[in-house]
């Protein structure tokens, strides 16, 4: 489907017309959106174009581009490959699902390998606009909640272990850690000093561990319901784990892999009713198997995995190994299976993650914001994706 008909003029101004614009508080018709030099410069009542490049939306939705804070890979490529070609392939695939900004996410690995990936992202971000930084997931996590990550490489956070990582906080935007580990509180303090978002995950924490981490600045949890402690008995008392603490604390934002496999619709409904639209951040947690045909084999930093029936599995098929989803797939699931209004599902994929890592000019259709945009059909399929006003995908 070809939306852009007229030639770009010398002022590089585009006008998106005849669409349904999605804002945090609902959907509005009868508005034009103007883009100039990669920024949204006006949102106004429909008016005749004055020489701008017209993008006729033909009654489809126009939403902010999606922001994925947890993506390991796609198309056989992984963040730990640490090269620009892999990163470009990952971004190109996720653009088909409406993603315009993402945090490439590392695996539990030796510190040197993680730093190599971080350095590669820093270099690649000069040419790949979608790269917003790195999410370091491990190695400071719990072996008891390893999931698909390699427990043998998990370690306690010591200044010697994390000191080199702290030299790269210009690129590291988020770190997942287990709050119960000795030294975790000190690491949280150092991360906060350096402007890094802290997320509790792959954790066997008791509720007092979670509360201490919260008091020191943890404001997120990683892939809620997956690889985290839940309610259990301590002596004769039943107490909360990281899951229940996160659900009960209004300031904590919960990542959610809404692919219908990691978390059932009933659990997603429970989370939505507990946290609301501003307390849920949709993430794909996509691994290298995303976009590959069934039967494809891939690796999650040394762990053998396979794609089957549209999901990513460990090689022995015993558990999930990340997801094969794109952000649009998660939005569709939230609408179709959880009953979330479309504009709220969009917020979970845009404004909430933008807030989570301080992307102040992304995540909403607003004057002065980046022209990162996605055109969506009534069937909730991506028709076109724009980054900084430049079309990077068209169906």
Feature-to-residue mapping (PLM):
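N-terminal metal-binding scaffold of metallo-dependent hydrolase/deaminase domains
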Residues: 1-49, 386
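C-terminal cap of metal-dependent C-N hydrolases
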Residues: 19, 355, 364-395
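Alpha-helical scaffold segments that flank or form the walls of functional sites
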Residues: 60-61, 69, 79-130, 153-168, ...
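Divalent metal-dependent hydrolysis catalytic cores, especially in the metallo-beta-lactamase
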Residues: 72, 88-117, 130-142, 169-180, ...
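Active-site gating loops and adjacent loop-to-helix segments of metal-dependent hydrolytic enzymes
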Residues: 92-102, 142-169, 212-253, 293-320
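Active-site core of metal-dependent hydrolases
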Residues: 167-294
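His/Asp/Glu-enriched, well-ordered alpha-helical/loop segment
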Residues: 238-256, 272-284, 290-369, 373-375
